[in-house]
């Protein structure tokens, strides 16, 4: 089966609570099925086992939700991003939400090579004051190293925090305010 690239669409989607416990490979299969049900003219790889040409920016860990997952879909026939989105919406399973569809230049570097960082939002149960939480956060961010042991090996997580200034925003629910 020979396929020619006619169009590449960049899709931004949300992975919600309903599907946060499915693996990345299962998510890929869900997207493949959804695109097939919507009769999207997917381009396929060459070879003995042709696969739809779908590429994700980065796998999301199991148990995480996201409002900014990105994937590229290669089509063998041109279709407007609006028509693509409109045709896909009724076939999306609960937990997947289409946020945007844009045309992407077919020769762009892969999504995986373009990922530079990720931003996480963490909810922490806290029964102390706002000032105590801010102090703990500043203590964490001013540490020279943040060691974590995994599989018997120590890792320093501190170099992975790029911009501590952006992490100082703190919102506590009203039940915790003093």
PLM feature segments, named:
Residues 67-121:
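Ordered, amphipathic secondary-structure segments that act as subunit-interaction surfaces
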């Amino acid at each position: 089966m020979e396929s020619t690239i006619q169009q590449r669409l960049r899709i931004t989607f949300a992975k919600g609570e309903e599907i946060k416990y499915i693996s990345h490979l299962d998510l890929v299969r869900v997207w493949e099925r959804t695109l097939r049900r919507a009769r999207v003219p997917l381009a396929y790889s060459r070879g003995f086992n042709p696969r739809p040409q779908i590429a994700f920016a980065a796998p999301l860990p199991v148990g995480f939700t996201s409002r900014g997952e990105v994937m590229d879909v290669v089509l063998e026939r041109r279709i407007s991003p609006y028509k693509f989105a409109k045709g896909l919406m009724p076939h999306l399973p609960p937990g997947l939400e289409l946020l945007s569809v844009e045309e992407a230049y077919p020769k762009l570097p892969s999504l995986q090579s373009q990922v530079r960082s990720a931003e996480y939002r963490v909810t922490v149960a806290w029964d102390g004051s706002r000032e105590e939480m801010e102090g703990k956060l500043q203590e964490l961010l001013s540490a020279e190293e943040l060691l974590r042991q995994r599989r018997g090996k120590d890792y320093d997580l501190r170099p992975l925090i790029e911009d501590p200034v952006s992490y100082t925003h703190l919102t506590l629910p009203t039940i915790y305010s003093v």
